[in-house]
Amino acid sequence: MGDRPAVRISAAITPVQQMLASGTGAVLTSLFVTPLDVVKIRLQAQQTPLFQAIAAESRPWFRVTRPSKWKCFLYCNGLMDHVYVCQNMSSCSNLYKTSTHFSGTLDAFVKITHNEGLRSLWSGLPPTLVMAVPATVIYFTCYDQLRDFLCYSMGYHGDHIPLIAGGLARLGAVSVISPLELVRTKMQSRRLQYSELMVCIRSSVAQDGWLSLWRGWGPTVLRDVPFSALYWFNYELVKAQLCEHYRTPQASFTISFTAGAVSGAIAAVLTLPFDVVKTRRQIQLGEMEALGAVSMKKPSSTWNMMRNIWIDMGYKGLFAGFLPRVIKVAPACAVMISTYEFGKTFFQERNLHQARCGL
């Protein structure tokens, strides 16, 4: 890259076309990654039983008061992590069945497909896409718009531009989606109707203020913003080097796929400690939403939690799950960015063709 301005592919397409390209990429990425995560969850389910807990009536709108079985776990569709709260195995039975014993990942794929049908590998996908697709559309469109603004309107060029644009774009997407994810967790854990939702939100805001809607925002930002900054920095760098190596002015699908996988793997490894902390925080917040805030102590701060992990397990604790994260993140990034770039190229060629026909 150096001080060379990048080819402005996005200049020939509209923001709406960027949104369509990123939305398509988001759906395809989710279709590809979701089976991997469903299998992971099912393998975890046979090792970790649901825990017993008493649901405390700590809010006027929190109606569950009887002893109940709860389990909070993370579900990822390749774009976002979502907290799922299981209540007596009923609210997420398709995701968390444990009737069949699995000896490993491949065995789980075969048995789930054979016993429950192919569709069961995509259990839980539609509800998560409701937020994952808008978040991805905001994120990728904002990145292109910010990068082009810095490069072509402000006149800045250099390797730091993707770093800045990627971090700011992710910060904006996380800030918009974070309250919606908290609301979704409340609705799921408490079986709230839409008519009850505003009462729930007003009660939460009255007690803890408007910032309570962004509970869990900090750990998400600490993981996702550095990840995005590193991802776009490495992606643009690797893509430019591959284009130079193959002497092509515009990245092909293969080049975008390769650059996406490499940059995704690098960013995943470097931000793994924040991912470990964020996972723990999300589980704690999910349990708090399910059981009532009064019944559980407030979760530790991000830095305290990271320090405790370091004291208890050392660097191995902070880099736990290294291989599974890379295996999941690298292909997800590759599929998403290559589909997005392909979509942008398609719209660019379409717009150029229409412009020529209009002359």
Swiss-Prot record:
InterPro entries: Mit_carrier, Mitochondrial_sb/sol_carrier, Mt_carrier_dom_sf, Mtm1-like. GO terms for molecular function: 2 iron, 2 sulfur cluster binding; metal ion binding; metallochaperone activity. Solcar repeats lie at residues 13-149, 157-241, 251-346. Disruption phenotype: Morpholino knockdown of the protein results in profound anemia without affecting erythroid specification. No porphyric phenotype detected. One of its GO terms (cellular component) is mitochondrial inner membrane. Keywords: 2Fe-2S, Heme biosynthesis, Iron, Iron-sulfur, Membrane, Metal-binding, Mitochondrion, Mitochondrion inner membrane, Repeat, Transmembrane, Transmembrane helix, Transport. It comes from the Eukaryota. Cleaved and degraded by AFG3L2; degradation by AFG3L2 is regulated by the ability of SLC25A39 to bind iron-sulfur. In absence of mitochondrial glutathione, SLC25A39 binds iron-sulfur, preventing cleavage and degradation by AFG3L2. The presence of mitochondrial glutathione prevents iron-sulfur-binding to SLC25A39, promoting cleavage and degradation by AFG3L2. [2Fe-2S] cluster binds at residues 72, 76, 86, 92. It is a multi-pass membrane protein. It catalyses: glutathione(in) = glutathione(out). The chain crosses the membrane at residues 19-39, 120-140, 163-183, 213-233, 254-274, 317-337. GO terms for biological process: glutathione import into mitochondrion; heme biosynthetic process; import into the mitochondrion; manganese ion transport. Coiled coil: none annotated. It is found in: Mitochondrion inner membrane. Residues 1-18, 141-162, 234-253, 338-359 are mitochondrial intermembrane. Residues 40-119, 184-212, 275-316 are mitochondrial matrix. Gene3D superfamilies: Mitochondrial carrier domain. The activity of SLC25A39 is regulated by levels of mitochondrial glutathione via its ability to bind [2Fe-2S] iron-sulfur cluster. Upon physiological levels of mitochondrial glutathione, glutathione prevents iron-sulfur-binding to SLC25A39 promoting cleavage and degradation by AFG3L2. Upon depletion of mitochondrial glutathione, SLC25A39 binds iron-sulfur, preventing cleavage and degradation by AFG3L2. Mitochondrial transporter required for glutathione import into mitochondria. Glutathione, which plays key roles in oxidative metabolism, is produced exclusively in the cytosol and is imported in many organelles. Mitochondrial glutathione is required for the activity and stability of proteins containing iron-sulfur clusters, as well as erythropoiesis. Involved in the early steps of heme biosynthesis. Belongs to the mitochondrial carrier (TC 2.A.29) family. This is Mitochondrial glutathione transporter SLC25A39. The lineage of its organism: Eukaryota, Metazoa, Chordata, Craniata, Vertebrata.
